[in-house]
Amino acid sequence: MTKLFIPYIMGNKDLIENATLLSENGADIIEIGVPFSDPVADGPVIMEAGQQAIKQGITIDYIFNQLEKHGDQIKCNYVLMTYYNIICHYGEQAFFEKCRDTGVYGLIIPDLPYELSQRLKQQFSHYGVKIISLVAMTTDDKRIKDIVSHAEGFIYTVTMNATTGQNGAFHPELKRKIESIKAIANVPVVAGFGIRTPQHVADIKEVADGIVIGSEIVKRFKSNTREEIIKYLQSIQQTLNN
């Protein structure tokens, strides 16, 4: 089975250009961050990118507008990574409608309690927008079974107990945990948080069905040339499916 490559970008003025480049260079699903003033799950790189986007005047309406106009340029699925506060403020039903209308494949909502995610799935499943489940290494086995039994799209395993993109030190129990999740899952199980290099990818792909890379991609879009970014993406893609 081909491993999934899921890069993350911040929703900013370059959203469509960056997403298009990723979709042309091996991305299977793109995670688009919605800037938020209090991003509790984000590491310093993504937090700074979010602050910059807010200064640029980027809002969820801007992101929806761009996806509505130019989403067909993105040649793969895309999901929104957003905090529940944004959905609540927008209005749950209006938000899910807009996601459907702008081609959003799914939502990653890091501060969403499991019980609330179940309500949203039941209430808004007819819009066809998947709510992606997150599993931390600290999640107990009973809760994992509950989460996995209702998972849709893919399962996002958080490979560190720290915030995103720090030192890349994977939890010693990580592989065992991912394997146990895969044994009971009906959707791909991907690993994210702290994955930056082809070496990290080679290590984690032994057990995971795919990887999410966030901070490193955001950093490279900020400071690298287009050619350097493409070269990096190719190195990840090569390692992932070698």
UniProtKB/Swiss-Prot annotation:
GO BP annotations listed: L-tryptophan biosynthetic process
EC number: 4.2.1.20
Cited InterPro entries: Aldolase_TIM (IPR013785), RibuloseP-bd_barrel (IPR011060), Trp_synthase_alpha_AS (IPR018204), Trp_synthase_suA (IPR002028)
Keywords: Amino-acid biosynthesis, Aromatic amino acid biosynthesis, Lyase, Tryptophan biosynthesis
Catalyzed chemical reaction(s): (1S,2R)-1-C-(indol-3-yl)glycerol 3-phosphate + L-serine = D-glyceraldehyde 3-phosphate + L-tryptophan + H2O
One Pfam family per UniProt: Trp_syntA
Pathway: Amino-acid biosynthesis; L-tryptophan biosynthesis; L-tryptophan from chorismate: step 5/5
Catalytic center residues: E31, D42
GO-annotated cellular components: cytosol
GO molecular function, one term: tryptophan synthase activity
Broad class of enzyme this protein falls into: lyase
PANTHER family the record matches: TRYPTOPHAN SYNTHASE ALPHA CHAIN, CHLOROPLASTIC, TRYPTOPHAN SYNTHASE, ALPHA CHAIN
Family to which the UniProt record says this protein belongs: Belongs to the TrpA family.
Function: The alpha subunit is responsible for the aldol cleavage of indoleglycerol phosphate to indole and glyceraldehyde 3-phosphate.
Quaternary state and interactors: Tetramer of two alpha and two beta chains.
Alphabetical list of HAMAP family matching this protein: Trp_synth_alpha
Name listed for the protein in its UniProt record: Tryptophan synthase alpha chain
Organism: Staphylococcus aureus (strain NCTC 8325 / PS 47)
Encoding gene, per UniProt annotation: trpA
